[in-house]
From Swiss-Prot:
Region described as Disordered: spans on this chain: 323-388, 457-480
Organism of provenance: Caenorhabditis elegans
GO biological process terms, semicolon-separated: alternative mRNA splicing, via spliceosome; mRNA splice site recognition; regulation of alternative mRNA splicing, via spliceosome
Function, as annotated: DNA- and RNA-binding protein, involved in several nuclear processes such as pre-mRNA splicing, apoptosis and transcription regulation. Ensures the correct splicing of genes involved in immunity to promote longevity in response to infection by pathogenic bacteria such as S.aureus.
Notes concerning its domains: The third RNA recognition motif, called PUMP domain, is atypical and may rather mediate homodimerization and/or protein-protein interactions.
Pfam family of the protein (one): RRM_1
GO cellular component, one term: nucleus
Entry superkingdom: Eukaryota
InterPro entries: Nucleotide-bd_a/b_plait_sf (IPR012677), PUF60-like (IPR006532), PUF60_regulator (IPR051974), PUF60_RRM1 (IPR034209), PUF60_RRM2 (IPR034211), RBD_domain_sf (IPR035979), RRM_dom (IPR000504), RRM_dom_euk (IPR003954)
Positions with biased composition (Low complexity): 330-354
Name assigned to this protein: Poly(U)-binding-splicing factor rnp-6
Molecular function terms from GO: DNA binding; RNA binding
Length: 749
């Protein structure tokens, strides 16, 4: 042991081995470790190892949570209320814009037209909401214009297109729509036009057609079968009546392409369908626009329901806020640094725009000792004169080009156009490109340099102005100078001067003798062919015929000048009377252009054929119904000899009937082979029975028995005896039957 210790003491220090890194052994985990080694610091962050709260603290936390929830609910309720008010205001603006689109102006209305007549004229285009006619209390007439408001905008547009220029009461109507800016929208709705444009833009996304004046007996299926000849119909909808039975006479059809829409409008507008002319036009509103015109009634939400909804919304928003405030990854946090905008590469073609302002004003790159004569003035680009020549400019002749007195700016030499190759951005510093020379002149020679630059610029400007295209005003002025034209005042002054000179010259002329006028000169009454030259007489004539020279006026009065003046006055009066008596040309009243359906395509012809069949069916149904009015029977046609003979027999005074009908005598179950013999035997007691007919209507359960006698007197006796008689427990009803119907085997009467 001693030897070993001695060896250790005598061993040199440099003989130690180098340190070797040994990996840390992986030890098995013993116990719970949270977040990191030891888990003490990080455990406090997540709430581990904290002391338990007392009941009072827990109550305070619950009260704080409840208060925070109440505040959140109040904020959400206020936000919902504000949003609801904004939606109501937006809906009201939309409704007002649609109301403007549904209104038309009708002008040039005759005084004989009343409101009911105007309503009948404009009712076929759609449901009318109101008609506003202004009345003059002094005259008791309207002011020849009115405002018609429809319930849908399409009806207003269709009425404007169809009724503008049409004649009503002897005058051509002027119908304009209120949806355009030319009609001067109301001052309280200046923001309606953008909404109208938005509505019309949305309507172009759908290929919808508006149809009005639809027959009440037609259904959506019938209307769809007529219009499906133009193309596939996506939707067909007729406006329902408030009572729930039938429709209101207008509706909408939606096609799947624009061609079908256009052909349907051109082919079916003003087409006779069921006795009414269809009115077909394009739609200017989307399908959901009518909900704004007639909004549904909104019931008030209970307070408890609104509070519960707000509480749920607050919880959802709190969860979203907690999820949004989670810590980001390093890559996400570093993204903002990478997203910062990088400096743009400077283009050699535009050096002045890429330099900062402070560099332009303060940087001195060239030597300030350079002589002024060696300063290079930037030449004008070769394309500059052409650009100025092509653009018209307003240039006054008195205006001269002068350089504004400003602070000296750096002069940049623009290089020739070339290919701009982007390069890497250099580090920030006062480094200018090699092709740019920026010189800030020294104040000692600033005046000389500025003067030379101004002289050269003036020379270049003079050369440019020679090739500048003159403006319109300059060309007119040069033309006026060349043609020696003058202004209106100068022309008037010249004309007045010329007239004054002529008057002065005439006043200076001596009095001469001239021939009398034909109306005053004496003529021989016996010579009718005497001309005015043969019978000329001399009279004193002054320069103004007694109007200018006083002396000549006195001389003319003595020798018949007054007669000449009276004759001239008479001529003037006759001319004025002739002008007044000219008959005024009556204003031609042009009838409006009639709109006819364009049946120039195969689809239109097929739709017309289908509509014709439907119209005939409707007419026959109306004529054969019991509720047919006299107006519907005005166009009744009689076809065939039998129908004509039947009608003429009804109109003539016919003989009495020999047939009696017995009703409610037997039931269908009582009919057997012995019934006819029993009836013949019973009815034979009152006369000679010729024929007995038993008509059994199984569908209705009625049985009618017809008995034909040889004389009408026998019919009266049988009727008096059998009417009201009991037979098999039934009360028999006997009455005379039409002889013609019985002869034609018609037992339905």
């Amino acid at each position: 042991m001693e030897e070993n210790s001695a060896d250790i003491e005598n061993r040199p220090v440099a003989a130690f081995r180098p340190a070797v890194s040994v990996p840390m052994p992986v030890l098995p985990q013993d116990g719970e470790v949270f977040v990191g080694p030891g888990g003490k610091k990080d455990a406090q962050k997540i709430g581990l190892g904290l002391s338990k709260l007392s009941s009072k603290r827990k109550d305070d936390i619950q009260m704080a949570k409840k208060y925070a929830m109440d505040i959140s609910i109040k904020q959400i309720l206020l936000r919902q209320q504000k949003q609801q008010q904004e939606n109501q205001q937006r809906q009201q603006m939309y409704s007002q814009a649609l109301s403007i689109m549904s209104r038309i102006y009708v002008g040039s209305i005759s005084f004989e037209i009343r409101e009911d007549m105007l309503r009948r004229a404009f009712d076929p285009f759609g449901p009318i909401k109101s008609i506003n006619m202004s009345w003059d209390p002094a005259t008791g007439h309207h002011k020849t214009f009115a405002f018609v408001e429809y319930e849908v905008p399409e009806a207003a547009l269709l009425a404007q297109e169809s009724m503008n220029g049409q004649m009503l009461g002897g005058r051509n109507l002027k119908v304009n729509s209120m949806m355009f800016q030319e009609m001067r929208l109301p001052q309280n709705m200046p923001q309606a036009q953008p909404i109208i444009d938005m509505v019309q833009k949305d309507a172009k996304k759908y290929f919808r057609v508006y149809v009005s004046s639809v027959h009440p007996d037609l259904s959506e299926t019938d209307l769809k079968s007529v219009f499906e000849a133009f193309g596939e119909i996506v939707k067909c909808q007729l406006a329902r009546a408030p009572t729930g039975r039938g429709h209101r006479g207008f509706g909408y059809l939606e096609f799947n392409n624009l061609t079908s829409q256009s052909e349907a409008i051109a082919g079916m507008n003003m087409f006779d369908l069921g006795g009414q002319y269809l009115r077909v036009g394009k739609c200017v509103t989307p399908p959901d626009a009518l909900t704004y015109l007639q909004p549904a009634s909104v019931s008030a939400i209970p307070a408890s329901v609104s509070v519960a909804c707000a509480a749920i919304t607050a919880k959802v928003m709190a969860a979203e806020a907690a999820a949004g405030s989670s810590p980001k990854t390093p890559s996400e946090s570093g993204g903002s640094r990478a997203a910062s905008p990088a400096p743009r590469a400077q283009s050699p073609a535009t050096p002045s725009s890429s330099l900062p302002t402070d560099i332009e004003n303060k940087a001195v790159i060239s030597s300030p000792k350079k002589e002024p004569e060696e300063i290079e003035v930037p030449p004008l680009p070769p394309s500059a004169p052409d650009v100025v020549k092509d653009e018209p400019m307003e240039i006054e002749e008195e205006e001269e080009y002068t350089i504004p007195e400003e602070k000296p700016k750096p002069v940049a030499i623009v290089p020739p156009p070339g290919l701009a190759i982007p390069s890497l951005v250099a580090p920030p510093g006062l480094i200018a490109p090699t092709e740019i020379g920026i010189v800030v002149p020294n104040p000692s020679f600033l005046a000389q340099q500025q003067q030379k630059i101004e002289e050269k610029i003036e020379e270049e400007e003079e050369a440019r102005t020679e090739r500048v295209k003159l403006s319109t005003s300059q060309r007119k002025k040069m033309k006026r100078e060349k043609l020696n034209q003058m202004t209106f005042e100068e022309k008037m002054a010249q004309v007045l001067g010329q007239q004054k000179a002529v008057q002065n010259q005439r006043m200076a002329d001596p009095v001469t003798f001239g021939a009398l006028d034909d109306t005053v000169a004496w003529k021989d009454p016996s010579n009718e062919d005497q001309t005015s030259e043969d019978g000329k007489m001399l009279a004193i004539m002054g320069p103004g015929r007694g109007g200018d020279n006083v002396a000549s006026m006195a001389l003319a009065l003595m020798d018949g000048g007054s007669s000449l003046m009276l004759a001239n006055n008479a001529k003037a009066k006759e001319a004025a009377a002739a002008l007044a008596l000219e008959p005024k040309k009556k204003k031609k009243v042009k009838e409006g252009k009639k709109i006819q359906p364009k049946l120039n395509t195969a689809q239109a012809l097929a739709a017309a054929a289908k509509a014709g069949e439907m119209s005939d069916a409707l007419k026959n149904e109306v004529m054969n119904s019991e509720d047919a009015s006299l107006a519907s029977q005005e166009g009744l046609e009689i076809r065939g000899n039998d129908a004509r003979h039947l009608l003429m027999t009804k109109l003539m005074r016919t003989n009495r009937s020999n047939v009696i009908v017995l009703r409610n005598m037997v039931t269908p179950q009582d009919i057997d082979e012995f019934l006819e013999g029993e009836i013949r035997e019973e009815c034979g007691k009152y006369g000679n029975v010729i024929d007995v007919v038993i008509a059994n209507f199984a569908s209705s359960g009625l049985v009618k028995i017809f008995v034909k006698y040889s004389d009408s007197m026998q019919v009266d006796r049988a009727k008096a005896a059998l009417d009201g008689r009991f037979f098999g427990g039934n009360t028999v009803k006997a009455e005379a039957y039409d002889q013609i119907l019985f002869d034609h085997a018609d037992y339905t009467g």
